[in-house]
Design a protein with these regions (language model features):
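Mature extracytoplasmic domains of secretory-pathway proteins
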Residues: 61-109
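Short beta-strand elements
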Residues: 142-151
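Internal, hydrophobic beta-strand segments that form the core of beta-sheet-rich folds
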Residues: 128-142
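Bacterial N-terminal signal peptides
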Residues: 7-17
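Contiguous beta-strand segments within globular domains
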Residues: 41-75, 111-118
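Short, solvent-exposed, Trp/other aromatic-anchored flexible loops in extracytoplasmic proteins
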Residues: 108-128
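A eukaryote-biased signal for short, well-structured alpha-helical docking elements
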Residues: 22-43
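Positively charged n-region of N-terminal signal peptides that target proteins for export
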Residues: 1-6
Length: 151
């Protein structure tokens, strides 16, 4: 009985904090990935193989056809968010910039993955990626941000 008096308030407190965690939009993980000539970022579903293939594409730029940002995000179910990824690069000592945007569906309790791609002539004119910044927007208000070390 005494254990129930201690356990029940802890359970109620933990349950009450769940909606607060799900309500705030956040960017969890951003993975910049090169794409090969067929638009693939990996040859198999294995994470080890993906990392090895990405290292190969980093060493051999002539095999690349684009750059994809796989972004894991979480947001409230009631809000439609917009994701924006800003890129800074360099092409033959000339600084370059690019912006990728996507309107996201409604969030929910679990996280979601979205992919934003820079490919074709835009990628060829962009050059090498130096830094990036990903943001989540609710209307005109920025609600979450993650950026690379060099941003």
């Amino acid at each position: 009985m005494r254990a129930m008096k201690v356990f029940l308030p802890l359970l109620i407190t933990a349950w009450a904090s769940l909606p607060a965690q799900a309500a705030s939009p956040k960017l969890i993980k951003i993975l910049p990935q090169f794409l090969d000539q067929q638009g693939r970022h990996a040859l198999s579903p294995s994470l080890f193989d993906r990392d090895a293939y990405q290292a190969r594409l980093r060493r051999q730029p002539e095999q690349r056809s684009g750059l994809r940002f796989a972004v894991q995000w979480k947001g409230p179910h009631s809000t439609s968010l917009r994701m924006r990824v800003e890129l800074r690069g360099a092409r033959e000592r000339t600084p370059t910039t690019a912006v990728l945007e996507e309107t996201l569906g409604h969030g929910g309790f679990f996280s979601h993955w979205s992919e934003l791609t820079l490919a074709g002539d835009e990628y060829k004119n962009f050059g090498e990626l130096v830094a990036w910044r990903a943001t989540l927007w609710d209307g005109s208000q920025q609600v979450a941000e993650k950026k690379s070390f060099l941003w």
